[in-house]
Amino acid sequence: MEANNQKKLEYPFSNRPKDGELLNVKGGIHWLRMPLPIALNHINLWLIEGNNGFTIIDSGMSTDEAKGIWRNIFNEFVSPKKVEKILITHMHLDHSGLAGWLSSELNIDPHFTQKEHNETQKIIGCLLYTSPSPRD
């Protein structure tokens, strides 16, 4: 349906991965549909295969289900030793929630922009150095 002369959104892929599954988009680009326990029921994550290993783009939300999906991927698709980088596009919890866990599991540091780092430091500072709001 078109409204206000806007075209309907068209998706470039007829096939979509099921929750927790990888779909090879093209070459070394793999699409991971990670389920979320909120109204937005999934997030799209990516594994990009390079010459020397894989880059994970975004981690998903910190849930036991998401950790299980990552463990399954490491057991069936890519050895943890083959992961070179973890890139976090932004610090929303659905994109960055498992960055620390993945970093620990893979023994590599996650990367994100300086702006996201600065904003996260501000939030942490507010949480650590301000009094909680009084409750009624």
Where are these regions (language model features)?
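N-terminal presequences and immediately downstream first alpha-helices
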Residues: M1-P12
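Short glycine- and acidic-rich boundary segments immediately preceding or forming the N-terminal edge
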Residues: Y11-P17, E21
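Conserved beta-strand hairpin/beta-sheet module of binuclear metal-dependent hydrolase folds
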Residues: D19-K81
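Short, glycine/acidic-enriched loop or turn micro-motifs at the edges of active sites
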Residues: M61, L93, D136
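Active-site metal-binding motif and surrounding structural segment of the metallo-beta-lactamase
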Residues: A66-T113
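Long, mid-chain structured domain cores
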Residues: T89, G125-L128
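A short beta-to-alpha transition loop/helix N-cap that caps and shapes the active-site region
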Residues: N118-I123
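Conserved small/polar residues in nucleotide/adenosyl-binding loops
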Residues: Y129-P134
